[in-house]
C-alpha cells in the first residue's frame, strides 16, 4: 500500500488546533529486499536524490590507530595548562573565578596533577575494544597475541604500554591522566578489567567485574566535571529505559561511574544486522526511547546528545538511554527557549542548535527522529556529514538538512529573532516542494507508514511546531487496534 500523504503534518499555528493524526491504515511490516521504492502518484516528490542520502559508516580503527586516536583526543581536550588550586589539606579546589558556565550545565574543568608528568604507570590498559566485530569493518588486532613482550594481566605488553604513555605525555602535561593511570585507579577500587572500549571525550570506559556485582559492569572513568555532572543527573533518574547508576567512586580527581553492562550500543547492533528490524521491533525501540525522553523532560532535563551510540541494547525490547555527560537542566519555563549553547553531535543536532538559536527540550525529539530512522533503515544515516572534516560544520549541516528534506521557506521559524530564519531561509528559495508535505528523503526508503509518519513528526523543522515525546507516544503506531 502506498504511503499516506503528509499534507498538514507539521502545521500547528495554534496549540489548540493541532493537526489531527491520520488513522492507521497499514499495520503489517513492509520491508522488501530493495531499499528504495516508488511512492503514491499524488504525493509530491522533489526532483533528484540528495547528494549524501546514505553515507557509509566509517571503518573501525585498528589498535595502532586507536592509540593514535587516544593521543589526539587527550591532547585536544585541554588547552589550559594551569594547575588546580590545592588547599592546605592537599585537596584540589575548583577555580570559580574563571568559571562563567552555569553550575547545572555540563562543561569541562581543568584537573591536573604535576606528579603525572614523569610517571609511567605499571598498570596495563586492556587494548581490545569491548564491542564485537562489525561486518565491513576491519577487526582490531588481538594484542594478547603480540610477540613484542610478555603480556600483562589486562592485555598490554610493557612495550605497548610505554608507547601509549609516551604518546599521552603531552596530554598529561595539560591536566589529563594517562589511560594506564585510569586503569590503575579502577583496579585499585577492586575491579578486574576484562577489556577497554574506545575512549570518549571524557575519559576511558572499562569492561569490568567486581565481587559485589553478580554480572559484568562498565566503569566509566572521567577527569572532567561533566562526568560528575552525569552522576548527579543519573542519581535523580529512575526509569526502566534509562541507564541506572549502580555506584560512584571519586579518587585522585577522577570520577568513576559504575554502570550495568549491555550487549552493545544500538549503532553496533544495527551495523551487524544483515536486514532491518521488524515492524514490532522498531515500534518497541521507538516506544522505549520516547518514554525515556518523556521521563527526562518531565524531570526538567535536556539530554542534548541522543544518538545510536548512546543507546544501549540487549534486545529490541530491552534498551536504555545513557551518556548524560552533555545534558543540562531547563532554565525557567520549559516551553521558553534559552541559550544553553551548542552541545552533542553535529550530525544529530537540531537545526536551531546548529544555528545558535535558543532552544527547548524538543531538540531531543529531533535527535530521536534520526535514531528511529536509523533503526528502521539500518543501512543509512539521515543528514550525515561526510567523513572529511569541514571548515564550517554547523553551517554545512543546516545546508544538508535544507537540501535533503527540500525544506520550504514557509516551514522556517516565524519569530523575528531566529538566526535559522535570518541566515538560512534564503537557501531554501530554490526548493519547489510544497510546504507541509512529505519531506524529499521519504521517496528513497521503504519504511512502514506509521513509522515514517512518526519520523516526519519528530523531524519538524520549526521547533515551535515540533511535538513533545508525550504527544508522539499518543500516535496510532503505539496504540494498534
Curated annotation (Swiss-Prot):
Principal localisation: host cell
Binding site for ATP: 197-205, 220
InterPro entries: Kinase-like_dom_sf, NEK_Ser/Thr_kinase, Prot_kinase_dom, Ser/Thr_kinase_AS
SMART domains with a match to the protein in the record: S_TKc
Entry's localization field: Host cytoplasm; Host nucleus
Record's keyword annotation contains Transferase: yes
EC nos: 2.7.11.1
Catalytic reaction equation(s): L-seryl-[protein] + ATP = O-phospho-L-seryl-[protein] + ADP + H(+); L-threonyl-[protein] + ATP = O-phospho-L-threonyl-[protein] + ADP + H(+)
UniProt xrefs under PANTHER family: KINASE, PUTATIVE-RELATED, SERINE/THREONINE-PROTEIN KINASE NEK
Protein name as catalogued: Serine/threonine-protein kinase US3
Amino acid at each position: 500500500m502506498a504511503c499516506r500523504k503528509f499534507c498538514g503534518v507539521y502545521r500547528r499555528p495554534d496549540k489548540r488546533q493541532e493537526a489531527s493524526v491520520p488513522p492507521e491504515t497499514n499495520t503489517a511490516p513492509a520491508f522488501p529486499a530493495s531499499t528504495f521504492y516508488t511512492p503514491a502518484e499524488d504525493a509530491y516528490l522533489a526532483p533528484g536524490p540528495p547528494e549524501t542520502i546514505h553515507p557509509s559508516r566509517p571503518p573501525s580503527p585498528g589498535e595502532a590507530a586507536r592509540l593514535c586516536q587516544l593521543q589526539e583526543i587527550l591532547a585536544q581536550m585541554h588547552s589550559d595548562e594551569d594547575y588546580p588550586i590545592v588547599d592546605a589539606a592537599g585537596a584540589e579546589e575548583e577555580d570559580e573565578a574563571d568559571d562563567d558556565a552555569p553550575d547545572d550545565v555540563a562543561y569541562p574543568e581543568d584537573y591536573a596533577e604535576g606528579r603525572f608528568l614523569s610517571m609511567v604507570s605499571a598498570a596495563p590498559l586492556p587494548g581490545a575494544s569491548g564491542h564485537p566485530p562489525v561486518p565491513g569493518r576491519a577487526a582490531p588486532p588481538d594484542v594478547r597475541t603480540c610477540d613484542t613482550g610478555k603480556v600483562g594481566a589486562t592485555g598490554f605488553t610493557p612495550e605497548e604500554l610505554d608507547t601509549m604513555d609516551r604518546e599521552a605525555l603531552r596530554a598529561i602535561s595539560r591536566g589529563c591522566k594517562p589511560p594506564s593511570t585510569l586503569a590503575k585507579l579502577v583496579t585499585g577500587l577492586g575491579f578486574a578489567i576484562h577489556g577497554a572500549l574506545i575512549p570518549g571525550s571524557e575519559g576511558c570506559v572499562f569492561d569490568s567485574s567486581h565481587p559485589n556485582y553478580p554480572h559484568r559492569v562498565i566503569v566509566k572513568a572521567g577527569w572532567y566535571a561533566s562526568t560528575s555532572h552525569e552522576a548527579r543527573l543519573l542519581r535523580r533518574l529512575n526509569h526502566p529505559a534509562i541507564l541506572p547508576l549502580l555506584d560512584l567512586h571519586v579518587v585522585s580527581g577522577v570520577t568513576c561511574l559504575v554502570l550495568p553492562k549491555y550487549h552493545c550500543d544500538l549503532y553496533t547492533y544495527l551495523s551487524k544486522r544483515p536486514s532491518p528490524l521488524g515492524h514490532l521491533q522498531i515500534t518497541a525501540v521507538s516506544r522505549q526511547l520516547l518514554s525515556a525522553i518523556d521521563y527526562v523532560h518531565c524531570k526538567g532535563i535536556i539530554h542534548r546528545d541522543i544518538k545510536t551510540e548512546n543507546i544501549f541494547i540487549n534486545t529490541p525490547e530491552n534498551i536504555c538511554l545513557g551518556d548524560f555527560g552533555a545534558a543540562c537542566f531547563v532554565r525557567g519555563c520549559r516551553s521558553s527557549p534559552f541559550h544553553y549553547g551548542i552541545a552533542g553531535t553535529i550530525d544529530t543536532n537540531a537545526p536551531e542548535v546548529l544555528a545558535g538559536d535558543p532552544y527547548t527540550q524538543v531538540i531531543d525529539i529531533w535527535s530521536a527522529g534520526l535514531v528511529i530512522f536509523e533503526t528502521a533503515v539500518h543501512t543509512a544515516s539521515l543528514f550525515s556529514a561526510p567523513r572529511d572534516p569541514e571548515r564550517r560544520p554547523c553551517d554545512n549541516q543546516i545546508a544538508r538538512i535544507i537540501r535533503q528534506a527540500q525544506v520550504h521557506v514557509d516551514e522556517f521559524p516565524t519569530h523575528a529573532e531566529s538566526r535559522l530564519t535570518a541566515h538560512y531561509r534564503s537557501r531554501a528559495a530554490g526548493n519547489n516542494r510544497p510546504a507541509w508535505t512529505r519531506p524529499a528523503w521519504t521517496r528513497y526508503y521503504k519504511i512502514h507508514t506509521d513509522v515514517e509518519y512518526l519520523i516526519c513528526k519528530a523531524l519538524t523543522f520549526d521547533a515551535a511546531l515540533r511535538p513533545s515525546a508525550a504527544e508522539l507516544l499518543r500516535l496510532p503506531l503505539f496504540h494498534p487496534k
